[in-house]
Amino acid sequence: MLIINDNNLSGPLQRVNGTGELSVQFKDGRSRISRLYQEGAAKIRMPQAVTGPLEAILINTSGGLTGGDRLKWDVALDDGASAVITTQACERIYRSGGGEARIATRLKAAKGTRLAWLPQETILFNRSILSRRLDVELEEGAQMLVVEATVFGRLAMGERVVAARFADRWRVRLGGRVIHAEEFRLGPDVGAELQAPAVAGGACAMATVLMVCEQAGRHLETARAIIGEEGGCSLWRVGKASKLVVRLYAPDSYALRRRLCPLVALLNGKAGLPKVWTI
């Protein structure tokens, strides 16, 4: 276990605690907010959109997380609603002074909905500790696109991650049945572990993309062309729906985005890229 001690710290440290909850309904021909709750550092803003899905931008006003911080997001879509959820900026996980930072996300999508969970990258700094959890509940007939990208240090800033801990847990259910599960862990020797050919082959930026819908297979070949040799794409049948799973890795966040942006634009249909995404 990565243990970090700093004898210069004294007294209780202020911790980040944030909870953001958003419910979306389809009413009068549009997807609209039915419930919004914000607490602590978690804020949610909605750019005005006359047509198309509701777009929500999640904001952590603390500017980043460190050991002991907690951030929770909860998004629910009622029948027929559609929404694109993203973040204002990359989430930053700073050096831990003790304990882990936790990010917990819960998504629910009723029948006939389309939900896109598209946060910008999570950046881990040296000696950071992060536990990230994603729980998704889909009803039959719901469509979903999920992207989670992680970057270990910013090479352009001369940053390298040698020691850190990262745990990423996913559970996705369709009609009450688990159709996708992940238990990804790195650390404490992240720098060495990322060099392993079976892990990242020296890359420090990676992303997982998951699409669940009836016709996910139509994107398979185009997605593979975008991904190239630094990643992979597979298609699975899950009952009446299909599941497209993409893994990407790159030497830095810029190289990752150059492929992730066109991939998201492809899979997100007419909604395309969130307005806040840039290369």
From Swiss-Prot:
Protein name: Urease accessory protein UreD
GO function term, MF aspect, one: nickel cation binding
UniProt key word Cytoplasm: yes
Gene name of this polypeptide: ureD
Record's miscellaneous remark: The second copy of ureD in this organism is annotated as a pseudogene.
Subcellular location: Cytoplasm
PANTHER family per UniProt: UREASE ACCESSORY PROTEIN D (PTHR33643:SF1)
Record organism: Brucella suis (strain ATCC 23445 / NCTC 10510)
Cellular-component GO terms for this entry: cytoplasm
Family indicated by similarity: Belongs to the UreD family.
